[in-house]
UniProtKB/Swiss-Prot annotation:
One of its GO terms (molecular function) is nickel cation binding. Keywords: Metal-binding, Nickel, Zinc. The gene is hypA. NCBIfam families: PRK03824.1 (NF003008). One of its GO terms (biological process) is protein maturation. Zn(2+) binds at C73, C76, C110, C113. Belongs to the HypA/HybF family. The lineage of its organism: Archaea, Methanobacteriati, Methanobacteriota, Thermococci, Thermococcales. Ni(2+) binds at H2. This is Hydrogenase maturation factor HypA.
């Protein structure tokens, strides 16, 4: 259900942007999915296609890019990737992070010094990286 809510927000944003730009058609949408969010791109794509039906975005190409999650320890400065520590997360933890990414601090610590005081450098959240539109008379 979380993916449908994300898809709805993306679709509303795309259509608002298209309207502001006086677009006659939305040709493509590029969406970046942060690895930490653990979003199912297939569900988001299906939901977006359903929500685009009957709009100027119907049939638009949907492109997904996954952004790798990277963390930086505020204590020792060490940077690491989620892929390096993923095995420490069980299914329940991954689901908790999926809904509330900030809880990652409760489940992970710096591999070098053990501190839970780290920042998410990238790979968190979902955002629109690009919208390709067509205006009346353009091709």
């Amino acid at each position: 259900m979380h993916e449908w809510a994300l898809a709805d927000a993306i679709v509303r944003t795309v259509l608002e942007h298209a309207q502001k730009e006086n677009a006659s058609k939305v040709l493509a949408v590029k969406v970046v999915l942060g690895e930490l969010q653990d979003v199912d791109a297939k569900i988001v794509e299906f939901a977006m296609n359903e929500l685009f039906k009957g709009t100027i975005a119907e049939g638009a190409e949907i492109i997904f890019e996954e952004e790798e999650a990277v963390f930086k320890c505020r204590n020792c400065g060490y940077e690491w990737r989620l892929s390096e520590v993923r095995e420490k997360l069980d299914e329940r933890m991954r689901e908790d992070i999926h809904f509330i990414p900030e809880v990652v601090h409760a489940f992970l610590s710096c591999p070098r010094c053990g501190s839970h005081d780290f920042e998410v450098v990238k790979g968190r959240g979902v955002y629109i990286a690009g919208i390709k539109i067509e205006k009346e008379g353009e091709q």
